[in-house]
Swiss-Prot record:
Belongs to the poxviridae A40 protein family. This is Protein A40. Residues 1-9 are cytoplasmic. SUPFAM superfamilies: C-type lectin-like. Residues 31-168 are extracellular. Residues 63-168 form the C-type lectin domain. The chain crosses the membrane at residues 10-30. GO terms for molecular function: carbohydrate binding. It is found in: Host membrane. SMART domains: CLECT. GO terms for biological process: positive regulation of natural killer cell mediated cytotoxicity; stimulatory C-type lectin receptor signaling pathway.
Amino acid sequence: MNKPKTDYAGYACCVICGLIVGIIFTATLLKVVERKLVHTPSIDKTIKDAYIREDCPTDWISYNNKCIHLSTDRKTWEEGRNTCKALNPNSDLIKIETPNELSFLRSLRRGYWVGESEILNQTTPYNFIAKNATKNGNIFVAQRILPNCIRVTLYNNYTTFLSYHYFG
């Protein structure tokens, strides 16, 4: 008695087609998520509503007598700092001095590089920034990357520490 032949080529074709569709779907989903992280309506509205001073360079925004440049580029702390200085020789990564500045920056970015580390306890690698800025459960965490370098991130039940982040 002859066994019916199994069409392995047909199965293989279906599996390959399924894998291709899955890869395309995943790649598309990752692009959508990345765009939402970089270009969110709240960021765009905040930037448009920000006061532009004449003494700030073109495309920079003003807050609390500081000119701020926002970038969508992902860079290391050192690359971000070098880019700041290349944009304007007198510029550097921002120094957060008040809870209001922290709140303003939070409305612009979820994470960013800053240029000062004095707000951290020098003996521990992690510390909360501006404890009176933690109202409504919004806690920002700083991670010491280098002796004079910290990265600020929103703590939302978990925090992912990366070596690259947006700089501002």
